[in-house]
């Protein structure tokens, strides 16, 4: 059974869930993707609970980690994650990041290269600058108005059907999106800000070297962005 806790930052309060079994047990840190929340990993948490230490969060400004000022970048998220790990006395975790969560994991590896026991990327892509074009970076910075003006019902439909093939997966994504029902402005802010800080992290042109054992997972039916192409390269 996971316990809900909070972590204070200058921009707001982060909510996270953990089951710290013992300091000698391996810790799995689950990081959901952009606009998703901790429920994304419900099935994985259910499977691994009791076998590993587990930490999963609602990312800054997402779901219960609100209100939150959009005055942070990808590296701030990685630093706050490290603060949570230090608070829970966790050393050498395995980070498991889906999409945006995978980018947070890479930023963490850049800042703390010797603190990871492993890194698993799920439908994410490399942060290295050479993988993206200047046009792609420019587009990433311009996404907020798209999400703000896209009809909500169509966004809900494309957002659920485009990210999963199973009924469970689509229903779960719909539930997570419905957190923002009636507040599309907040949803657009989260998405727009997320893409923007992703572009800025790429522009830093850092090595983003993963020094620990790593596993790249990309679904054969994943058509989000250029994920398959990036991982193949």
How should each PLM-predicted stretch be described?
Residues 43, 107-111:
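Active-site signature of alpha/beta-hydrolase-fold catalytic machinery across serine-
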Residues 130-132, 150-209:
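Conserved alpha/beta-hydrolase catalytic His-Asp/Glu region
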Residues 12-67:
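Conserved HGGG/HGGXW glycine-rich cap/lid loop of the alpha/beta-hydrolase fold
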Residues 192-232:
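Conserved serine/cysteine hydrolase catalytic core
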Residues 1-13:
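N-terminal cap/lid segment of alpha/beta-hydrolase-fold proteins
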Residues 97, 101, 105:
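Gly/Ala-rich beta-loop-alpha elbow adjacent to hydrolase catalytic centers
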Residues 110, 117-149:
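Flexible "cap/lid" loop of the alpha/beta hydrolase fold
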Residues 11, 55-97:
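Active-site loop/oxyanion-hole signature of alpha/beta-hydrolase fold enzymes
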């Amino acid at each position: 059974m996971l316990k809900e806790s909070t972590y204070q930052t200058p921009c707001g309060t982060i909510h996270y869930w953990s089951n710290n079994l013992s300091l000698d047990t391996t810790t799995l840190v689950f990081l959901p993707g952009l606009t998703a929340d901790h429920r994304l990993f419900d099935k994985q948490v259910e499977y691994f609970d009791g076998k590993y230490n587990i930490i999963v969060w609602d990312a800054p400004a997402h779901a219960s980690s609100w209100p939150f000022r959009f005055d942070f970048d990808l590296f701030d998220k990685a630093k706050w994650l490290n603060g949570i790990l230090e608070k829970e006395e966790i050393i050498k975790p395995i980070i498991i990041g889906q999409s945006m969560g995978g980018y947070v994991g890479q930023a963490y590896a850049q800042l703390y290269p010797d603190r990871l026991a492993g890194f698993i990327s799920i439908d994410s892509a490399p942060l290295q600058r050479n993988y993206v074009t200047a046009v792609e970076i420019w587009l990433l910075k311009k996404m907020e108005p798209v999400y703000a003006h896209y009809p909500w019902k169509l966004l809900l439909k494309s957002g659920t059907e485009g990210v999963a093939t199973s009924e469970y997966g689509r229903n779960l994504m719909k539930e997570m999106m419905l957190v923002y029902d009636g507040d599309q402005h907040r949803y657009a802010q989260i998405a727009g800000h997320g893409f923007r800080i992703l572009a800025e992290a790429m522009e830093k042109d850092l090595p983003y070297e993963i020094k620990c054992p790593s596993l790249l997972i990309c679904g054969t039916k994943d058509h989000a962005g250029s994920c398959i192409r990036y991982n193949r390269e």
